[in-house]
Regions:
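Juxta-kinase regulatory segment immediately upstream of eukaryotic protein kinase catalytic domains
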Residues: 1-40
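Conserved ATP-binding subdomain of kinase catalytic cores across diverse folds
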Residues: 25-132, 155, 159-160
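Charged catalytic carboxylate motif
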Residues: 90, 149, 203
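AlphaC helix of the protein kinase catalytic domain
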Residues: 133-142
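Conserved alphaE helix
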Residues: 145-153
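Conserved catalytic-loop position in the HRD/HxD motif
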Residues: 161, 166, 184
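Hydrophobic residue at the +6 position relative to the catalytic HRD Asp in the kinase catalytic loop
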Residues: 167-174
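C-lobe/activation-segment region of protein kinase-like
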Residues: 175, 179-222
Length: 222
């Protein structure tokens, strides 16, 4: 995929010039879209992802927000160690590499890192997967073929070197055509060798237990 970078005094924005023809930092600001009625759904999660109607097409905006006790001190600031090492730029890189390897992930449209003193704030805008619902919502109506295809998809990701930091039933999507996708690659890594799936699958199955999903776990393990 194409990639260009906008550089400001304390701001860097990665963007796809094939989809985003005019770069504006406001596109990464939830308030900008709320004021203009561009928010079509609130998708929840700690980052409170927003589904948007943008000039680049339907998209999902997610700001990087902290959780736990540290959020009481700083809910959206991280120590700055370089633009390329920001959460948004690392996620952009992971998505780009996975797309190059033909894997089903949302296409990144924009990613920003804004430095403020020793800290930074960041956000990412990705293409919306139309008509998709999460595995958490769809698990009860899946057939054996669906579980087979999900298992095959996960094995493709593992073989491609993907290390997902939060593999759970909410981060796996099924679209209207029956295609599976993975989302939310914050803190993900893409290795130059196959990844060990054990811990990722353990995390996924813990989310199954929490949500009361039984499913065909045996079909998700190689």
């Amino acid at each position: 995929m194409s990639e260009q970078q906008f550089r400001g005094p304390s701001l860097r924005i990665l963007y796809d010039p094939q989809r985003v023809t005019a770069v504006s930092p406001e596109w990464l600001d939830p308030g900008f879209w709320r004021l203009r009625g561009g928010v079509t759904a609130e998708l929840g999660g700690r980052g409170q992802a927003l589904q948007l109607d943008t000039p680049a097409g339907p998209a999902v905006l997610r700001r990087y927000l902290r959780g736990g006790m540290v959020a009481r001190v700083s809910h959206d600031r991280y120590f700055f160690t370089g633009y390329s090492r920001s959460r948004a730029f690392i996620e952009w890189s992971a998505l780009s590499r996975l797309l190059e390897r033909g894997l089903p992930v949302p296409r990144p449209l924009m990613a920003s890192c804004e430095r403020r003193g020793p800290y930074y704030r960041a956000g990412i805008l990705t293409e919306l997967i139309p008509g998709a619902r999460s595995l958490a919502d769809a698990a009860g109506v899946l057939g054996e073929d669906d579980w087979h295809r999900l298992g095959a998809m996960l094995q493709r990701f593992f073989a491609a070197g993907m290390v997902h930091a939060d593999l759970n039933a909410h981060n796996i999507l099924l679209d209207a055509a029956g295609r599976w996708y993975l989302i939310d690659f914050d803190r993900a890594r893409v290795l130059d060798r196959p990844a060990r799936p054990d811990r990722m699958l353990q995390r996924l199955f813990r989310s199954f237990d929490k949500l009361g999903i039984e499913g065909r776990r045996d079909l998700l393990v190689a």
